[in-house]
From Swiss-Prot:
GO terms for molecular function: carboxylic ester hydrolase activity; fatty-acyl-CoA binding; long-chain fatty acyl-CoA binding; long-chain fatty acyl-CoA hydrolase activity; protein homodimerization activity. One of its GO terms (cellular component) is nucleoplasm. This is Cytosolic acyl coenzyme A thioester hydrolase. Both HotDog ACOT-type hydrolase domains are required for efficient activity. Residues 350-380 are annotated as: Disordered. Keywords: Acetylation, Cytoplasm, Fatty acid metabolism, Hydrolase, Lipid metabolism, Mitochondrion, Repeat, Serine esterase. The gene is ACOT7. Its EC number is 3.1.2.2. The active site is at 66, 255. It comes from Homo sapiens (Human). The lineage of its organism: Eukaryota, Metazoa, Chordata, Craniata, Vertebrata. Catalyzes the hydrolysis of acyl-CoAs into free fatty acids and coenzyme A (CoASH), regulating their respective intracellular levels. Preferentially hydrolyzes palmitoyl-CoA, but has a broad specificity acting on other fatty acyl-CoAs with chain-lengths of C8-C18. May play an important physiological function in brain.
Amino acid sequence: MKLLARALRLCEFGRQASSRRLVAGQGCVGPRRGCCAPVQVVGPRADLPPCGACITGRIMRPDDANVAGNVHGGTILKMIEEAGAIISTRHCNSQNGERCVAALARVERTDFLSPMCIGEVAHVSAEITYTSKHSVEVQVNVMSENILTGAKKLTNKATLWYVPLSLKNVDKVLEVPPVVYSRQEQEEEGRKRYEAQKLERMETKWRNGDIVQPVLNPEPNTVSYSQSSLIHLVGPSDCTLHGFVHGGVTMKLMDEVAGIVAARHCKTNIVTASVDAINFHDKIRKGCVITISGRMTFTSNKSMEIEVLVDADPVVDSSQKRYRAASAFFTYVSLSQEGRSLPVPQLVPETEDEKKRFEEGKGRYLQMKAKRQGHAEPQP
């Protein structure tokens, strides 16, 4: 108890210090990405730190833990989304005009570089790196700090895309205020990322049409054996002040379902290794019943790819039908009690659709493996 009390006092001191740094304009905690240097806000609020840099932080408590005792991956995703929502909403309201709130449209691939422990302080730093006419790109770094030793480490990197929705009509997308780039190449690189994610979002929306159906008495190691679903009634605590679900709430539920699928498949401790792009196809309003479904799509020797689909049912509005709200692929690894990675049982696809999804997952796995190896090669 004494250590916890001391940790809480230190955490409060750290929050106060972070606030002073933010006001003083000393920028973000953690390393920046070299290809995406911070840009400058244009408008009445240009006195903020570069790009309106947003820093949030809090101590990780026992209710943030997964069954293994580390911080739940969904909790980290939720903190990432909150930081992104703050900075993008702030920027989109930086000029005079119709007020808006930034809604999450997409999360690019997110890597879990290192586990975060209960009792550590999570520092989440966000900055805007590109804007188009109707969207904002935000890059987020997550650092963990051991407040007893002072040691810090980078645990997560993520890129998120937001769109500004009018407060008067949340179905209306507003224009994004411009930013000033430090160099022309930075804007060109951002435009390429924007066009790439836009194309992939369109392809994903058409591809993810089928619904996960339960199967009686499935065989072990098959897709049906581990597929899982959660049903959740969207309440006020899940929503923004404007009545639709926080993207972070949806991501945490998706991570929980993916974790259940992975645990059922390998019967060991599991941990989130990465999240492929999460696409938010439509808003989820308060009062909807959402079904979050997960199924195994591919296994390598030591990793599992799980597809997660979110369907929303507006039960209080008979004029609306059930619709696909979000979709993503999660990658999990199996761990021993000592925290070492273990081989996973190989998935046995049965139907033609399952075999097709397996080959598609294999392609994504090999593509990402080649990309990692390319980054690991020494520079000449």
